[in-house]
Amino acid sequence: MIGLIGKKIGMTQIFNEVGHLMPVTVIQVEPNTVVALKDKEKFGYSSVVLGLGELKEKHTSKPYAGQFSGDIKPLKLLKEFRDFDKEVAVGDKLGVEAFEKVSYLDITAISKGKGFQGVMKRWGYGGGRASHGSKFHREAGSTGHCTTPGRSFKNTTMPGRMGFDKVTVQNLQIVKIDPELGVIMVRGSVPGKKDATVFLKSAVKRAK
C-alpha cells in the first residue's frame, strides 16, 4: 500500500478520451516528509509515518518535537500508513509521482458538518401529509413501545447532529497526475469541504 496526505481543492469537469464529460475532484499533494519508520521487530507491525505542513516553534511542545529526528522540523500533520510498499528513508520527500503505477485510490476525510437536523434530512423520513388538516408534517412519530419494554431501543433513528464524520470513499479512479503542479485528479466526489485535509491510499480491494 502507498499513502499520502493531501488537500482538497475542489471539483471540476473534463472530457475523457472518448469525449464524455467526467466530474473530477482536484487534490493538491505537497511533498510529504518521511518522519519515522516502524518495523515488526520493535512495534509488531511495519509502517511509515508521513508529515506535512510547517509548525512554528512557539506552537510546538517539547514532547511533540521529540518525535522528529535529525534535521526534520516539527510538522503540523502526521499520518501513519501501514504496510508501505515503497522503499523510503527518514527525511525523504514523497509527492504525487508515488501514485504513477496506481489506478484506484481509497480517500479518507472528515465530511461536511450539517449541524442539528431532523429525521427527514438526516434519515430520509417521508414525513406526514402537508395539508387536509394534518398536524403531523416533519415529526419523527413514535419511537417507543407499550409498557413492555417501556423504553426506546438504542440506535433508533432520531434528530441529532449530522455530518462531520470520518468517511472513506473506496475505488476512486485516478484520471490525471501532474507532478509539476503537485496535483492529482480523481473521478467523482471526495468527502469534506474545500481545503479539507484528505488521506490518499492505494485501493485495498483492487490489484492496482
From Swiss-Prot:
Q: Mind listing the GO biological process terms from this record?
A: translation
Entry annotated with the keyword Zinc: no
UniProt keywords, alphabetically: Ribonucleoprotein, Ribosomal protein, RNA-binding, rRNA-binding
- Provide the function of this protein: One of the primary rRNA binding proteins, it binds directly near the 3'-end of the 23S rRNA, where it nucleates assembly of the 50S subunit.
- Name the protein family: Belongs to the universal ribosomal protein uL3 family.
Extract the GO molecular function terms from the UniProt entry: rRNA binding; structural constituent of ribosome
Superkingdom as given in the UniProt entry: Bacteria
Q: How does it assemble?
A: Part of the 50S ribosomal subunit. Forms a cluster with proteins L14 and L19.
Give positions of region: Disordered: 134-159
What cellular component GO annotations does this protein have? Answer: cytosolic large ribosomal subunit
Check the record and name the NCBIfam families matching this protein. Answer: L3_bact (TIGR03625)
Bias category Polar residues: which stretches?
A: 144-158
Q: List, alphabetically, the InterPro entries matched.
A: Ribosomal_uL3 (IPR000597), Ribosomal_uL3_bac/org-type (IPR019927), Ribosomal_uL3_CS (IPR019926), Transl_B-barrel_sf (IPR009000)
Q: Output this protein's name.
A: Large ribosomal subunit protein uL3
Q: Which PANTHER family match?
A: 50S RIBOSOMAL PROTEIN L3, LARGE RIBOSOMAL SUBUNIT PROTEIN UL3C
